[in-house]
Amino acid sequence: MPAATPALDALRDTLPDDLKDIRLNLGSVLTGENLQPAQALGVALAAARFVRCRPLADALESDTRAALADGAVATIADAVAAAGLMAMNTVYYRFRHMLGKESYEGRSPRLRMSRMAQPATSKLDFELMSLGCAALAGCELCIRNHEASLLHLGASEDACHDAVRIAAVVNAAACGLP
């Protein structure tokens, strides 16, 4: 059963008529059957923070607190961590991948990212959030690695697809908000 999102619904209603498709997508994208409500909300919140859209992030955080009760703290913490880590990782790994030089490939990144191995929710949930952010950044290497990790953890391709759909719609909604 999808989570109620009254704060997001109120914000969604402020999108202009020119973005009716985005308004409708924002109303439906969190209701898929391939992700649990906590996963869908976590991906959406991570995406909102990743694209630095404070109104969306605030609405999603409010709805996450209301919908998940005790589980909200972990989901919110992981969404914040995933957005922050992916903001760093997508720049670094996209740089290495785009250059394609062995001299860079062999170097240690020397960037801390231990939270990825010790999420507050689950490895699978954190990877879903990370995949959404990787797609937003267009980091091919990151997308491939997070999708492979998710499949290894037992997630379906449909779940991966839904996570990226959520991130895409959040990104589009951010464009229409002041």
Where are these regions (language model features)?
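Acidic/histidine-rich alpha-helical segments that form the ligand environment
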Residues: 107-141
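Preference for long, well-ordered alpha-helical segments
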Residues: 128-178
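Acidic, glycine/proline-rich low-complexity segments that act as flexible tails and inter-domain linkers
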Residues: 1-41, 45-120, 149-152, 168, ...
